[in-house]
């Protein structure tokens, strides 16, 4: 299907991957509730029939695109039973750097997090996926408390604080640069770990 796509996408990606990437970038650009299937078709220059060879409908397409770019692409398989909270944070910090650049296209981290929130609110299947991922993080927190890596604080408090740091969607006073937001996220998670770590 190479002739269906502009050369900027390169030939190394599969047709399905191109559709997922374009869908995700459009969701970031326009917002969850403003992207139409026709927008994706127009951006790629493909027929609706070709898209439906890969996805049953719009909901499945959005789910698959978001699962890939929120989880599969940035979080490798980790042993959540053995990993320390410090190691978990290091993996998350690497992911923040990767998330802000998708194949050469800069991604606004605040829009990225806003889309994540919208998907959780509007797509039950994605909400279940997010809950499963959060349960893995809670396991890491629970084990970190048991092992004495961090102070004995409520799991929910630690988890909610981590989500608040990584998942910020706006700044009250002004919208800072993308690099500043990423820098603050990494600094804040480091400071938080220092606060909860047992001496």
Regions found by a protein language model. Give the residues of each.
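Amphipathic alpha-helical segments used for helix-helix packing
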Residues: 100-124
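Amphipathic alpha-helical packing segments from all-alpha helical-bundle domains
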Residues: 78-79, 121-149, 160, 190
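Helix-turn-helix
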Residues: 18, 26-60, 64
């Amino acid at each position: 299907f190479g002739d269906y796509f502009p050369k900027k996408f390169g030939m190394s990606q599969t047709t399905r991957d191109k559709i997922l990437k374009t869908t995700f970038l459009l969701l970031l650009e326009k917002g969850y509730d403003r992207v139409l299937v026709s927008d994706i078709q127009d951006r790629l220059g493909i027929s609706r029939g070709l898209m439906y060879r890969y996805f049953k409908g719009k909901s499945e397409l959005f789910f698959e695109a978001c699962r890939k770019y929120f989880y599969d692409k940035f979080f490798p398989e980790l042993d959540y039973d053995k990993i320390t909270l410090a190691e978990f944070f290091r993996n998350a910090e690497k992911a923040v750097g990767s998330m802000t650049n998708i194949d050469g296209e800069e991604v606004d981290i605040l829009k990225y997090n806003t889309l994540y929130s919208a998907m959780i609110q509007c797509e039950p299947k994605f909400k279940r996926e997010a809950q499963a991922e959060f349960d893995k993080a809670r396991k890491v927190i629970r084990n970190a408390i048991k092992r004495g890596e961090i102070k004995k604080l409520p799991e929910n408090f630690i988890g909610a604080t981590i989500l608040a740091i990584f998942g910020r969607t706006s700044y009250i006073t002004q919208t800072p640069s993308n690099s500043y937001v990423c820098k603050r996220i990494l600094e804040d998670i480091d400071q938080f770990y220092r606060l909860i770590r047992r001496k």
